[in-house]
Amino acid sequence: MALIKELLGKSPQIGENTFLAETATIIGDVTMGKDCSIWYNAVIRGDVHYIKMGNKVNVQDNAMLHCTYQKHPLNIGNNVSIGHNAIVHGCTIKDNVLIGMGAIVMDDCLVEENSIIGAGSVVTQGTHVKSGEVWGGVPARKIKDINSQLLEGEVNRIADNYVKYSSWYKENVKHIEG
């Protein structure tokens, strides 16, 4: 069972059909939509501001979601994949977005719908990623416009796959002593 904690009178609200890995941590003012999945060692800390997540959001292994005290909440839309080891902090992520493995999205950023942040990228504070763009690098910059192959083949495929993977874990995982 995941570590789920109330803090300062605020408890996480977990959406229906959501998978929580047993080593995931969810604290405080966190609201999730349905069909989400929070994977191993992912941390979602709604301790200093709120975190709102839409439907079909997957937060992959070792990812960190946080906010800035009394300044920047974290809002995440629907059909969003947050890759392994990514950090998403006090920003707004719209619908149909892929945040690549190890990417960092900092305070007060806006990532509009149908966009990709490449693996290992650092999206610096206050950056605005427009709809349909692919960004990468350190600091991140626009690389190209997204096309239908990237949208269907990456953004939607990964989000759909994580709904499928979470069903495997809910139905088939067996604890082995040892």
Which residues does each PLM region occupy?
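N-terminal segments that cap or nucleate solenoid repeat domains
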Residues: 2-38
